[in-house]
A protein has these predicted regions:
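N-terminal metal-binding scaffold of metallo-dependent hydrolase/deaminase domains
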Residues: 1-38
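Active-site core of metal-dependent hydrolases
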Residues: 154-281, 304
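His/Asp/Glu-enriched, well-ordered alpha-helical/loop segment
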Residues: 228-241, 259-271, 276-357, 363-366
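Divalent metal-dependent hydrolysis catalytic cores, especially in the metallo-beta-lactamase
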Residues: 60-62, 76-105, 117-129, 157-170, ...
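Conserved, mostly hydrophobic/aromatic
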Residues: 58, 123, 179, 209, ...
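Generic structural signal for well-ordered alpha-helices
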Residues: 79, 103-110, 149-150, 176, ...
Length: 384
């Protein structure tokens, strides 16, 4: 049975009144109309603005569960938590672990991908820089071994879509080329790479920056490192830049500047969410490392008298980021592009990221502050 939704809709970068027909889980038609035009009989009025649902490239968990728990039920719960909050498509992200734990995690997440709960797997580590390890266990960081890499890719059965790495490590450039040739997106992150090393990695096939600015050397005018190199690569070489635009990882001014320089087609808003997303303050863990969430910011736990620990993932959802950035002055079409069509295009999800005929019927309804009020996934309202 066809359902017709009528109301404001974000289509091709503009909000217009439209009727969106949904049939068997897909968008059957999108028809712009005048507000004064008579409604199709039986159509449902939508209270808010319809927009394509969000695609999160970088998510570790939420709702008290995490993909790093190495438990199938917990992983499914984390995925559904983000679906219900507007990210109906996502990569399930793992962190640095032992080889055995990574293999187990990849196998569990590959099953979830087979079931359609997630759209792939992101390995964040273990081939990262110790000096920029952030919330990764430095004892488990290592140079890439292609035999180990291939074991993980085989365990993923084609579902490993992104790998974050520090290209300056011994064998890092070889890993970039190997991932590219294996159909996996090499992402530069947790790195001390120089400007030249980033350029070399981009030339070898790296096409993504993992949470730009975070876990990278600050931009210095005499010794430019990864940050300006990746910004330049976004403008000239088609690299996509992840931004955790939640106000804790980056200032809103920084986000707006990157959007102005690179444009929304080269920026992907990501949550980097951990199990604490949607839960609140308190103690948690990530990849076996203890952390505490206070005031909505997660940090590694330190001993008495020790300095404050590194930020350890996010506690927001992509929907929260979109609302925040719209309130900070970024236009809704730009914010929505960075949350939906840009990451969908990177992942090759041709039926996501836009309200158009033939797309999977994944949409969000937004209020006047760009907050998500309803979510549809594959033609089904998730609040029904």
């Amino acid at each position: 049975m066809t359902t017709v939704l009528r109301g404001p809709a974000l289509i091709d970068g503009a909000v217009v009144t439209a009727e969106v027909a949904i049939d068997r889980g897909r968008v059957a038609a999108v028809r712009p109309v005048q507000p004064s035009d008579p409604a199709t009989p039986g159509s449902e009025p939508v209270l808010g603005t319809m927009s394509a649902a969000y695609v999160d490239l970088h998510c570790h968990g939420g709702g008290g569960s995490a993909f790093t728990d190495l438990d199938a039920d917990a992983a499914a719960a984390a995925a559904r938590h983000h679906h219900a909050r507007g990210s109906t498509s996502l990569l399930a992200s793992l962190v640095t672990m032992s080889v055995a734990d990574l293999l187990r995690g990849v196998e569990i997440l590959a099953d979830l991908a087979d079931d359609g709960l997630v759209d792939g797997i992101h390995l964040e580590g273990p081939w990262l820089a110790e000096a920029r390890c952030g919330a990764h266990d430095p004892r488990l960081l290592r140079d890439p071994d292609l035999r180990e890499v291939d074991r993980l890719l085989r365990a993923g059965r084609g579902h490993v879509r992104q790998v974050t790495l520090a290209p300056e490590r011994e064998g890092g450039m070889r890993l970039v080329r190997h991932l590219r040739d294996s159909g996996v997106h090499p992402a530069i992150g947790h790195t001390t790479a120089t400007f030249a090393q980033v350029g070399q990695a981009v030339g070898a096939g790296a096409d993504l920056a993992t949470h730009l600015f975070n876990a990278m050397d600050p931009w210095h005018h005499r010794t430019p490192g990864a940050v300006p190199a990746l910004l330049r690569a976004a403008v000239h070489d088609g690299v996509t830049l992840e931004l955790i635009a939640d106000g804790a990882h980056l200032s809103d001014d920084t986000v707006r500047t990157v959007m102005d320089l690179a444009g929304p087609s080269r920026v992907a808003f990501v949550s980097d969410a951990i199990a604490a997303a949607g839960i609140g303050d308190g103690p948690f863990s990530l990849g076996g490392l203890p952390l505490v969430v206070s005031g909505g910011t997660a940090r590694l736990t330190k001993g008495p008298g020790e300095p404050e620990g590194s930020i350890a993932g996010g506690t927001s959802h992509v929907a929260d980021i979109v609302s925040r950035q719209v309130s900070a002055g970024i236009s809704l079409p730009y914010a929505a592009e960075s949350a939906s069509s840009t990451p969908a295009r990177l992942l090759g999800l041709a039926d996501r990221g836009a309200l158009r005929a033939g797309a999977r019927a994944d949409l969000v309804v937004l209020d006047g502050a760009a907050r998500v009020t309803r979510v549809m996934r594959a033609g089904r309202w998730l609040d029904d």
